[in-house]
């Protein structure tokens, strides 16, 4: 397929090209197999880097349809049982790059091409002065440095699941384990020194891992021709970890993001409260902290991580949870009587951080 689209207020069209395929096989309602592939091309990458192949494979075994299972005593209780697994790769070609003019990250295109920026004469910090007096003129300057080696970001996803039904499917449950490894993540290069005067295009340098489990349980029953009810619940646990983010070597070892979940906050560790002024005198100075002009008994006392006698940003360490919950759960029920029905569902989250500002 070929795809051509236009963005809002954008003259250059977006273009992509690709081919997809699928093969499905089933034998005797017991053995299932599926193979998919996508061969995709993106305008964001240079020739020789534009296309990526992303296959996936899935297998399933309906154990409850096996003759030996039907003859077993367990089939009288667990009437259905299935195990399944899948392994696949997907790609991402959307690139977010730092824009020094806007001082923010924006979606970037054609990062394999050198970028040049128009200099606005109304901006006194960036315009040029020629001749005598304050005669500012427009011009062109070098912008983001091209990266011709950039290519697809890939994600390898593994899933193993179990499905079961008990008491003629009056009680069913599904449990899944998943593992995802994102590699060659399109990440902004952080190792270019500031005296270069510009920024480098994103590169395939990031690696992040994500894994967890999901559980779903359902119970439903009919009581007579007019009344039925159902109860259901679910729970999931997921945790990600940064493997590599291209962090500069100058970053303190205990402040590097590698080994922690994405966006783990850096905070100071408290040791309690200052008891008196003697306690303040014996402790590392906290006057370097923002807003701290004086320290009094009853104020929080922080730990000097690097032992230099001063509490500042270099004493912050990765601590606590991120604002993305690791645990999500829910439960609910429904009741039906003739044409009347009533249902409710509760949801909750756990193991996440909230920053409270006094």
Language model segments and positions:
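Extracytoplasmic gating/loop element in the C-terminal half of outer-membrane beta-barrel translocons
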Residues: 42, 295-297, 349-358
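Outer-membrane beta-barrel translocator domains and adjoining extracellular loop/strand segments
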Residues: 6-12, 46-51, 71, 96-100, ...
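Outer-membrane beta-barrel proteins
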Residues: 7-11, 23, 45-49, 71-73, ...
């Amino acid at each position: 397929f070929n795809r051509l689209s236009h963005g809002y207020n954008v003259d250059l069209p977006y273009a992509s090209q690709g081919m997809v395929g699928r093969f499905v096989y089933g034998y005797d309602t017991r053995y299932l197999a599926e193979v998919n592939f996508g061969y995709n091309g993106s305008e964001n990458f240079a020739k020789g880097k534009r296309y990526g192949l992303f296959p996936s494979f899935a297998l399933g075994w309906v154990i409850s349809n096996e003759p030996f299972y039907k003859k077993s005593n367990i089939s009288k209780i667990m009437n259905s049982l299935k195990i399944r697994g899948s392994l696949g790769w997907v790609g991402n070609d959307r690139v977010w790059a730092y824009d020094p003019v806007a001082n923010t990250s924006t979606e970037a295109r054609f990062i394999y091409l050198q970028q040049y920026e128009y200099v606005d004469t109304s901006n006194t910090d960036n315009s040029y002065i020629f001749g005598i007096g304050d005669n500012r003129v427009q011009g062109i300057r070098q912008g983001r440095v091209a990266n011709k080696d950039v290519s697809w970001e890939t994600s390898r996803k593994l899933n193993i699941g179990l499905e079961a039904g008990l008491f003629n499917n009056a009680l069913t449950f599904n449990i899944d384990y998943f593992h995802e490894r994102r590699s060659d993540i399109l990440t902004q290069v952080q190792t270019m020194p500031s005296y270069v005067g510009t920024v480098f295009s994103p590169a395939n340098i990031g690696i992040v891992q994500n894994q967890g489990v999901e559980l779903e349980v359902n119970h439903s029953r009919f009581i007579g021709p007019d009344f039925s009810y159902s109860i259901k619940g679910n729970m999931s646990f997921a945790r990600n970890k940064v493997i590599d983010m291209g962090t500069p070597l100058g970053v303190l070892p205990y402040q590097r993001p590698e080994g922690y979940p994405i966006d783990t906050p850096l905070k100071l560790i408290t040791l309690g409260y200052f008891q008196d002024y003697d306690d303040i005198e014996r402790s590392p100075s906290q006057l370097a902290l923002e807003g701290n002009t004086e320290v009094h008994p009853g104020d929080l006392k922080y730990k000097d991580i690097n032992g230099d006698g001063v509490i500042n940003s270099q004493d912050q360490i990765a601590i606590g949870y991120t604002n993305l919950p690791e645990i999500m759960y829910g439960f609910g029920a429904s009741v039906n009587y003739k044409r009347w029905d009533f249902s409710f569902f509760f949801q909750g989250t756990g193991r996440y951080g909230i920053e409270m500002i006094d």
